[in-house]
């Protein structure tokens, strides 16, 4: 059995953006019975509550409310909880797949722990978050540094965009990278122009 711990999305079922939808589709299309997914889920209530979602072992994490820094605490707590679970259940050679660079400034500590138990650390860097104008200069500097640190300590950087992979390769030549595009649902929709979701969407954007 190969155990894969997914850290960094808000959890399941998907209710938000790209990472959450990616995780939902990933577990929904699992084929091999030899793979078991463990997914951290952000909670405002408790830490350590487990529930099954489409065969994935989901567990809640309730980080302290620290404003924008809450996501950093969330990822750190999720990794620590996963490490305890791995030890408790005797899981061998786990894979950690971290979505985003949020905890990059602290990743050396966690990378050493993961690799000391024979684990593998994979990272999806998302986009160029540090360039977004909504962040103050200190936050942009933190995110840029986090991005750099992730490339140093991850076993593999997985980009879902060719441009991001090229940027990582050119900026951090020591990094180990690969490109895996998101899949596309080619099945034809059964919705019509009269269905409520379609009408709501038109109304929202008219």
Question: What positions do the PLM features span?
Answer:
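A short acidic, helix-capping loop that chelates divalent metal ions and anchors anionic groups
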Residues: 129-134, 188
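Carbohydrate-associated surface elements
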Residues: 163, 183
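A short, charged, and often flexible helix/loop element on the N-terminal side
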Residues: 55-80, 133-139
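N-terminal subdomain of nucleotide-sugar transferases
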Residues: 1-44, 89-91
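An aromatic- and histidine-rich active-site surface loop
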Residues: 72-83, 93-126
């Amino acid at each position: 059995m190969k155990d894969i711990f997914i850290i960094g999305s808000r959890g399941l079922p998907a209710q938000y953006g790209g990472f959450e939808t990616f995780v939902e589709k990933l577990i929904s299309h699992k084929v091999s019975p030899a793979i078991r997914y463990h997914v951290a889920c952000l909670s405002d209530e408790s830490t350590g509550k487990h529930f099954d979602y489409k065969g994935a072992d989901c567990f809640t994490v309730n980080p302290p409310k620290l404003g924008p820094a809450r996501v950093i605490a969330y990822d750190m707590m999720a990794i620590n909880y996963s490490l305890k679970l791995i030890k408790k259940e005797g899981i061998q050679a786990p894979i950690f797949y971290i979505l985003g660079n949020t905890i990059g400034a602290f990743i050396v500590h966690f990378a050493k722990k993961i690799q000391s138990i024979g684990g593998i650390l994979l990272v999806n860097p998302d986009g160029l978050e540090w360039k977004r104008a909504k962040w103050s200069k200190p936050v942009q500097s933190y995110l840029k540094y986090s991005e750099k640190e992730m490339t140093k300590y991850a076993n593999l950087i997985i980009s879902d965009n060719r441009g991001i992979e090229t940027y990582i390769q050119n900026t951090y030549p020591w990094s180990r990278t690969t490109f895996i595009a998101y899949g596309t649902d080619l099945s034809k929709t059964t919705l019509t122009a009269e269905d409520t979701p379609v009408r709501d969407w038109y109304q929202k954007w008219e």
